[in-house]
Amino acid sequence: MKNGHTNGNGKSSKKKYTFIDLFAGIGGFHIAFHNVGAECVFASEWDEQARKTYQKNFEKISPEMFASKNFAGDITKIDKNAIPDFDILTGGFPCQPFSQAGFKKGFDDTRGTLFYDIAEIIRIKKPKAFFLENVRHLYAHDNGKTFETIKKVLTEELGYSLYHNIVKASDHGLPQNRPRLFMIGFRNTKIPFKFPEKKPLAFTMSDVFDGAKVNRDVGFTLRVGGKGSKITDRRNWDSYLVNEKVVRITSKEGKKMQGFPDDFNFPVSESQAMKQLGNSVAIYAIQDYAQKIVEALDNNYE
């Protein structure tokens, strides 16, 4: 499965790396890492509608994963020791507050949150690298305590390096800003990691609307809920002037804005498809960073 509008990535690696796809949603991370030559050996997603879309699109790409029943549901109920060995952990996890005790205790502060499950998997499975994605507000969440706790757990307690950056989808070819916090780390802390260079837009909102005249080159960030605001309303994110008429985007356009390939299918309702796209990741940005992770492992393989 390749991107609908290619961004020029997808170089082959010296080694076939394996990865797991946590909080998988509809598989944005799966597409990005598949495109750089990695193989998904385990995925976890609790939402039944998202699971339908994920299975529909990846059953042929990762048949062994589905055949071995390694497409799990609720991450909190997974036997983490039973997860297959893998090289890279990936996941876009929800932003949640930690214990009011602050971040003095580190790992224990994260109990009861979904980050705790990520940290537990890293502790038990000891992957070569991880790639985590979250909303940019995580960095300043709870006066910075949330991020400091995450940093302490990943570096001081689990022993990984940590590189982090606020990344816009529009800096990696896609026509929406969608700023997100990317966190990358390596078990071998001596591995240097260089952020990928920014790229010009691969296409604009005009291309998204099949060449029509559109009032913006870069679109609004896709969201979940809150649809239907007037085009002049600052809360509007789903309406555009297309050939001088107000048009609301559908999953057809949303799919392009997130970098999903043209043959990606939604076996769910249109409202569910839009919700799933709003919850997904910007594939071009993920793929650019995935490529750099693979290159770093290739050049510094343990």
What do these predicted regions represent?
Residues 41, 162-163, 282:
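A local structural micro-motif
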Residues 78-88, 95-239, 243-247:
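Class I S-adenosyl-L-methionine
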Residues 205-302:
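C-terminal target-recognition/interaction regions appended to catalytic cores
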